[in-house]
Design a protein with these regions (language model features):
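Transmembrane helix interruption/hinge and helix-loop junction motifs
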Residues: 98-105
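Structural signal for membrane-spanning alpha-helices in multi-pass inner-membrane proteins
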Residues: 17, 46-49, 120
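Long, highly hydrophobic alpha-helical transmembrane signal-anchor segments
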Residues: 1-41, 82-85, 90-98
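Short membrane-interface loop/juxtamembrane segments of multi-pass integral membrane proteins
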Residues: 63-88
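Alpha-helical transmembrane segments and their immediate juxtamembrane interface regions
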Residues: 107-134
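Perimembrane helix-loop junctions in membrane proteins
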Residues: 20-24, 53-60, 100, 124-131
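Membrane-water interface of transmembrane alpha-helices
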Residues: 44-65
C-alpha cells in the first residue's frame, strides 16, 4: 500500500501543478493547498518513521541510506517505485518553481518530503537490515 500511496501523492501533486502553471492566478491556491498538505502529511509520516526506526534499530544495524534511500534494504522493484515516485516529485517541484519563480509555486519544493517518508516507512516496516552486533 505504501508504493500505491506514494504514487497517488505524486499524481495529485503533478496534476495540481499543471493548472497552476497554465493559469497561476486562479489555480495557484489549489497547488499551494496540495503542496502544504502533502508536506505536512510527509512531516507526520517522517516522525512515525523515526519512532519505528528507533525501535527497530535496537536489533538491526540501520543506516540513513538504507532507511530513506533504500540502499541495500529493499528489492530492486520496490526501490524503483518508491525512489521513482520521489524523483518525479522533485522534478515537478523544481520545474514548477523554475518556470514561475518568486511565486507560491515555490512551496512545491516541500512536497518531496512525503516521498522520502514513504521510503522510510517501507524500509522500517519491511527493509532487510543486518542484525546488530552485541
Amino acid at each position: 500500500w505504501m508504493i500505491v500511496a506514494s504514487w497517488l501523492c505524486t499524481a495529485v501533486f503533478a496534476l495540481s501543478a499543471i493548472p497552476a502553471l497554465v493559469d497561476p492566478v486562479d489555480a495557484v491556491a489549489v497547488y499551494f493547498a496540495v503542496s502544504v498538505a502533502l508536506f505536512l502529511a510527509g512531516c507526520a509520516l517522517f516522525m512515525v518513521d523515526l519512532v519505528l526506526a528507533a525501535a527497530r534499530s535496537r536489533d538491526a544495524a540501520m543506516g540513513i541510506g538504507g532507511i530513506f534511500f533504500l540502499a541495500g534494504s529493499a528489492p530492486r522493484p520496490v526501490q524503483l517505485h518508491l525512489l521513482g515516485s520521489l524523483v518525479v516529485q522533485i522534478v515537478v517541484a523544481v520545474l514548477a518553481a523554475a518556470l514561475d519563480p518568486f511565486t507560491p509555486l515555490a512551496f512545491g519544493t516541500l512536497v518531496p518530503i512525503i516521498g522520502l517518508a514513504f521510503c522510510g516507512l517501507w524500509s522500517v516496516r519491511h527493509g532487510l537490515f543486518p542484525e546488530r552486533a552485541q
